[in-house]
Amino acid sequence: MRVMGVDPGLTRCGLSLIESGQGRQLTALDVDVVRTPSDAPLSSRLLAINEAVEHWLETHRPDVVAIERVFSQQNVKTVMGTAQAGGVVALAAAKRGVEVHFHTPSEVKAAVTGNGTADKAQVTAMVTRILALQTKPTPADAADALALAICHCWRAPMIAQMAKAHALAEQQRRSYTAKLKAAR
């Protein structure tokens, strides 16, 4: 499975591509950070992110895109920019029929470090170790994008099992409801 991990942001948007093998074997294929000037109009910044993501989707053809879910921050402007960048990425993937999943920062930290409250240095160190990289990925947005892809690779089997369980439960609920109606 090829997973494109995205750490969304207007100033710096981290992009990564990881391929999963058997078990927990992972290979980093590419990583980059899209930068946009803070003084540029919002529409220009979002367009630059969209163009970079479109290029990545065309070049790398991921099976799934994993995006960091925006969480509450004190700076509303930062949250809005992050959400807008994430929306641009999700839309670009959806237009190509690529599955999109969102993961919270604590899910990513827990998957990569075993600690949902790990700091950036711990996440970067574990990403470097897990992927057997020669140097630490910089800036932090690159490491975070890799961590998102790792998280999804390792959580995907559980996500699939949960989806099957929910579908089965819904099917059984409908069957039971139909039997109740027939018995009346």
Swiss-Prot record:
Its cofactor is Mg(2+). Mg(2+) 2 binds at E68. Mg(2+) 1 binds at D7, D141. Its EC number is 3.1.21.10. It is found in: Cytoplasm. GO terms for biological process: DNA recombination; DNA repair. Binds 2 Mg(2+) ion per subunit. It catalyses: Endonucleolytic cleavage at a junction such as a reciprocal single-stranded crossover between two homologous DNA duplexes (Holliday junction). One of its GO terms (cellular component) is Holliday junction resolvase complex. InterPro entries: RNaseH-like_sf, RNaseH_sf, X-over_junc_endoDNase_Mg_BS, X-over_junc_endoDNase_RuvC. The keyword DNA repair applies. One of its GO terms (molecular function) is crossover junction DNA endonuclease activity. Signal peptide: none annotated. SUPFAM superfamilies: Ribonuclease H-like (SSF53098). Belongs to the RuvC family. Homodimer which binds Holliday junction (HJ) DNA. The HJ becomes 2-fold symmetrical on binding to RuvC with unstacked arms; it has a different conformation from HJ DNA in complex with RuvA. In the full resolvosome a probable DNA-RuvA(4)-RuvB(12)-RuvC(2) complex forms which resolves the HJ. This is Crossover junction endodeoxyribonuclease RuvC. It comes from Mycobacterium marinum (strain ATCC BAA-535 / M). The lineage of its organism: Bacteria, Bacillati, Actinomycetota, Actinomycetes, Mycobacteriales.
